[in-house]
Amino acid sequence: MKRSLRALTVLLALAVVSAPDSAYAQKVFKIAAIVPVSGPAAAFGLGCQRGLEMAAEDIGVFTVAGEKYKMEVVTYDTVYAPDKTVAAINRAVYNDSVKYGVIIGAGVHPPILPIIRETGFLDFAFAAAGKQVTNPENPTVFRIMASSDQLYQTYAVAIAGKLGAKRIAFLGPNDELGKNDAKAIKAEAEKMKAKGVSFVGDEYYERGARDFGPALLRLIAQKPDIIDTDGSPTGSIALIAKQARELGYNGYFVNSTAVLEAKAISDIAGKAGENIIALRIWANPPTKLYTELAERHQKKYGEAAPGTLWETYGAARWLVDTITRAGTFDTKKVAGALAGSSYANHPFGPASWGGEKAYGIKRQIVIPIPASILKNGKWEPFDVKSGKFD
């Protein structure tokens, strides 16, 4: 018996000695996915959630100030509704003691910004719009996708020139995002006035709408060459395209801030979905990491990766690198360190922060920005630009 006990003691000691570092990672670093995982914008939220989870897998155990941590993703479904987003961030901060997270939607940000300012929550904003979200009053808000201003300044003139378009119309959601982006594209159209380009009309719809006929009739009467659909999600733009073609529209659609799914558009709109130009979509992979993440997602979930996955993954890896170097989880100290850093390993290519001239603070991600056009149910390359934004 004594011999057996001694043998067991030796085995336990060996097990402790040979245990991997992760066995001692008793502390958890929580990061929130405050995103829609149900409803019409669910694909956006699932991409963010899975991007964070894949980043957590790859980060493994990391050390901050001599303590070992593992990242844990906590998801709060917002259904892309402002009231549910307010409830979600309150639950994350006050109930679950979460200090960091990804939050989707320019339209849901206005009511949560006071909470972010009060608590110092570090928000990776997956949101378009512009100065309403990114400004010196919100030093812990980092936009991890191209802003509306950045996208329109980068592409509005270029697309109109490439297509020879002269008349531009706008159809977007009736919220903070839509109203802001209509102003942005009007400003860009004004820059092209000397070249005969004009902005001919704007219409708005309530999110979740399915009948766009009346708004489209009013816009099509203005004979636009391009209808900009702003951040309309996949299901909405598919219906917009289908209904517009039925009403006789033969021009182009441009989708600036959403991340669209080609197959879903084709399933709904068929050939009517042709000639949708979408920004922020890569027809060809920009990096090896981009391809690896796409393949991992396909293998695990049996479907193509949602378009929000890569930017979220890159932001999470960048954040943990910064926290590790800073040696603290203090969000204000981390925000300062993050703003002064760059990141070479983003899935889209080298990344940094800009926007100081435009927004008064460096909290706008600067990464390569692609544009693709839908042809025969698949994205084809249209253009790639640097995304430089001062």
Predicted regions and their residues:
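N-terminal signal peptide c-region/cleavage motif recognized by signal peptidases
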Residues: 18-20
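Extracytosolic ligand-binding ectodomains
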Residues: 2-12, 24-390
